[in-house]
């Protein structure tokens, strides 16, 4: 090899190495963009900020018996929402808009809409609400995923309006984490009147104002509705224990609220039961007081059609042991049963 060839080799090798490094960096950036960033880009136009004004009654101790002396206290609340139709149907959490006297929706492009409260439909039991706004231009709707196909450890992204930042700056906040657990159940919450069952747990940071915003996977598909956090005693912010309602349930409730304005849970099995106390147990020569005794079955009812007869003892409902009337009510609530659903006795 002559001197010219040696010089060319010495020059070309660093250049080639530099090109490989640059190309690797570009590819790395491309890979990063194709997962997290591109997923956010697919969804962010469908996320809205919600500003709620609530007028609540405030009593003073020495006036507690005189309604005429109650004053009105104005409270402002922030939340997030997700567009589910081009013509302006938005889903959020019920607790975000509870007791609202005014609701304002802000879209990704900075447009603000005041909501007609007659166009708000709620299901307190599932903590889901649907809002309709009147829009001139079509809104962007996201791709919906399948919350039944999720796996623990899967990467997820939370989008929303924490602490009202979106309302203030027109910029959504994104946080990333994994699915920490699936099918997490908290049962019926008496204070809120809502049931939180089969929740998605994630460590993607969720804070005040994120409620009602989407949880999405790295395909840019919505898999849940961010709902609440469990915080330490000294904090109201996220400590990595965050929970979302599975999107399959959200879509089911959304469809009922949009089409009918309510979720129909006014059903009647036609079965009347009573608890079995010690006296009744001895009279019937039973071995325990477990279960409910059937004392009447209405004609042509679903109970009669199922073959239930007077004198039967119901020991389980939907595979849950029954000992009191409250147990039956708890199963109906926690299973989020609607008219037309089946009960297994």
PLM ranges: what are they?
Residues 1-29, 38, 118-119, 151, ...:
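C-terminal recognition in membrane/secretory proteostasis and scaffolding
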Residues 27-90, 96-104, 109-114, 125, ...:
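Glycine-biased strand-turn-strand hairpin within the trypsin-fold
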Residues 45-51, 81, 88-92, 117, ...:
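Terminal peptide-recognition signature
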Residues 59-74, 120-127, 168-170, 182-200, ...:
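Gly/Ser-enriched beta-turn/beta-hairpin loop segments
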Residues 73, 77-81, 141-146, 199-216, ...:
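Gly/Ser-rich catalytic serine loop of serine hydrolases
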Residues 80, 86, 99, 146, ...:
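Short, flexible surface segments
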Residues 85-167, 251, 322-323:
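Conserved active-site neighborhood of the chymotrypsin/trypsin-like protease fold
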Residues 100-102, 139, 159-176, 185-212, ...:
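Active-site loop architecture of trypsin-fold serine endopeptidases
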């Amino acid at each position: 090899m002559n001197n010219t060839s040696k010089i060319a080799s010495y020059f070309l090798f660093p250049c080639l190495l530099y090109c490989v490094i640059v190309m690797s960096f570009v590819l790395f950036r491309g890979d990063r963009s194709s997962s997290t960033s591109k997923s956010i880009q697919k969804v962010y136009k469908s996320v809205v900020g919600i500003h709620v004004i609530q007028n609540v009654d405030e009593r003073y101790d020495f006036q507690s018996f005189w309604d005429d002396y109650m004053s009105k206290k104005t409270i402002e609340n922030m939340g997030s929402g997700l567009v589910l139709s081009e013509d302006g149907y938005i889903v959020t959490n019920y607790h975000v808009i509870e007791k609202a006297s005014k609701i304002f929706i802000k879209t990704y492009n900075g447009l603000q809409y005041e909501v007609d409260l007659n166009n708000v439909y709620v299901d307190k039991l599932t903590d889901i609400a649907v809002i309709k706004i009147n829009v001139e231009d079509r809104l962007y709707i996201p791709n919906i995923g399948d919350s039944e196909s999720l796996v623990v450890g899967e990467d997820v992204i939370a989008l929303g309006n924490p602490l009202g930042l979106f309302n203030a700056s027109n910029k959504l906040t994104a946080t990333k984490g994994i699915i920490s657990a699936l099918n997490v159940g908290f049962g019926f919450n008496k204070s809120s009147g809502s049931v939180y069952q089969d929740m998605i747990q994630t460590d993607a940071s969720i804070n005040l104002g994120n409620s009602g915003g989407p949880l999405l996977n790295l395909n840019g598909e919505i898999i849940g509705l961010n709902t609440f956090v469990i915080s330490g005693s000294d904090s109201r912010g996220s400590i990595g224990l965050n929970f979302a309602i599975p999107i399959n349930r959200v879509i089911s409730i959304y469809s009922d609220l949009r089409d009918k304005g309510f979720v129909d849970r006014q059903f009647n099995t036609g079965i009347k039961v009573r608890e079995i106390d010690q006296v009744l147990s001895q009279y019937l020569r039973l071995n325990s007081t477990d279960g409910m005794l059937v004392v009447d079955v209405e004609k042509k009812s679903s109970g009669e059609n199922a073959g239930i007869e007077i004198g039967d003892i119901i020991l389980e409902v939907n595979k849950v042991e029954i000992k009191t009337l409250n147990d039956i009510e708890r199963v109906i609530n926690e299973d989020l049963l609607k008219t037309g659903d089946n009960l297994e006795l």
